[in-house]
Design a protein with these regions (language model features):
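FMN-binding flavodoxin-like domain, especially the glycine-rich phosphate-binding loop
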Residues: 1-36, 40-133
């Protein structure tokens, strides 16, 4: 079984959350959705793989750029865990949006998580998150 993390983490908070979740997964390969030089349509995930997809929630939705790039990846029925990372305010419909995109791309969603990270603009909100709490 191969393990992947598909990330969009412009300020690093989402990446920290994803690392905490996948720290015991063997040989995780990272696909960075913020890369401007990557052909995301070239990714074909093996069907027996486990994939973590993590994105921030900005204004209750996932960034459209991240959704558009994620939609290009062929999930090939790989099992997928979704993570919406938010700054202790709200994550709105981010997980629903991610699930719709994952299903359309051929992933099999098995779990969804909302996780708190330090707010990217107002750092007093969820300061220091994620942490052991």
């Amino acid at each position: 079984m191969k393990c992947y993390q598909i990330l969009f983490s412009p300020t690093g908070g989402t990446e920290k959350v994803a690392a905490a979740i996948t720290q015991n997964w063997p040989g995780v390969q990272t696909i960075d959705l913020s890369s401007t030089s990557t052909d995301f349509a070239s990714f074909f995930i093996e069907s027996g793989s486990l994939v973590l997809v993590a994105m921030p929630s900005f204004g209750d939705v996932a960034p459209q750029l991240a959704i558009d790039r994620f939609a290009q990846i062929n999930g090939n029925r790989a099992k997928c865990v979704l993570v919406a990372v938010y700054g202790n305010r709200a994550y709105g419909s981010t997980l629903v949006q991610m699930e719709d995109t994952a299903n359309a791309a051929g992933f099999q969603v098995i779990a969804a998580i909302s996780a708190i990270a330090e707010h990217s603009i107002i750092h007093e909100y969820a300061a220091g998150r994620p942490n052991a709490e």
